[in-house]
Amino acid sequence: MIAKPEREQIIALINREVVPAIGCTEPIAVALCVAKATETLGKRPERIKALLSANILKNAMGVGIPGTGMIGLPIAIALGALIGKSEYQLEVLKDSTPDAVAEGKKLIDSQAISIGLKENIEEKLYIEIICEADGDTATAIIACGHTNFIYVALNNQVLLNKQTTSTCNEDAKEPELNLRKVYDFATTTPLDEIRFILETKRLNKAAAERSFKGNYGHELGKILKSSKSEEQILGSNTFTHILSYTSAACDARMAGAMIPVMSNSGSGNQGITATLPVVVYAEDNHKSEEELIRALTLSHLTAIYIKQSLGRLSALCGCVVAATGSSCGITYLMGGTYEQITFAVQNMIANLTGMICDGAKPSCALKLSSGVSTAVFSAILAMEHKCVSSVEGIIDNDVDRSIRNLTRIGSQGMNETDKLVLDIMTHKQCD
């Protein structure tokens, strides 16, 4: 068993990274930054300027904003100024009302909001908000983490300044993880210390079940659950249940439903993907509560571990990371050993590496379905002691080095892809 001080560090890490969120976390983080700047200003802004990194722009362009029936940044910014409370963190817009949305539309129509690309920055997650009213100016900056404020100022008075060249590398207190340590923590930690992970099941399963009753996004989850043609082709089984629950929760979230989900590493979709395949497999196969708790812990902590070297935002679709976690959790529930769990990870990396992120949007449900179906395939292969070998592609004999290969491709190798994707998104013709 891992020593208690290190266990406490890892538990604190999970509690930082697995948190509730309403709506896509990129526009919500922008709304949070607006809320902080507005609170600092102390009055309703007359003008709001947003300067954002390319990845924030990409992830906020086509996604629904909770409770508004609208997509994109302008309404998120307007509501952040009108009703946002920074203390709510990633639930900053939970007090939104129809009246607030109507007022937000007026603010947008008044041309009070401007949005631009922040040039000459290294951070992939960067949000700078400048609010002005009655000659006063308030500035708030979030960088590197969706709730990580690094600068707050009112006029010439600096209230917070963590702007340094190592802003994104200030995680010295984070525990050093590898896959073996992740596995040991998940499988040996006293149960009462990690029971809190069950909250991921409660929130994310509720989101899926709410989605089944509504009409959200492309309705992939609902169709997979109830379509006769789907049942004739795929049947009704644990595999199709995993696909329908995971995609349904994503359908609702990307469409802007006012439904909280438990996120992972700043992403609600990653939280959904790390949770629901594991929950559905456990329930369909009558696994014990302890087995579910340990499998969910393994899934979420694996995703956190991979994101440590990948970064918050990248050109790589986050479902690759989160589905790798759920594949580990499913393999564990199947009775897999640590070796078989490493096989599942290797199989995932061999399959899904390179799937691009082209922003948060309703069609993310399709990518999540691809990710979790691959998670199931990888677990099945692993249980048969089948693993992609190190003579194939980017796979290394050492699973942690394979993970580094994945994250190097996502964080370094796909930078030009990221730029091209954003260029296409900002210049394409839309209906």
UniProtKB/Swiss-Prot annotation:
One of its GO terms (molecular function) is L-cysteine desulfhydrase activity. It comes from Phocaeicola vulgatus (strain ATCC 8482 / DSM 1447 / JCM 5826 / CCUG 4940 / NBRC 14291 / NCTC 11154) (Bacteroides vulgatus). It comes from the Bacteria. GO terms for biological process: L-cysteine catabolic process to pyruvate. It holds the Pfam family SDH_alpha. Disulfide bonds: none annotated. This is UPF0597 protein BVU_2091. Belongs to the UPF0597 family.
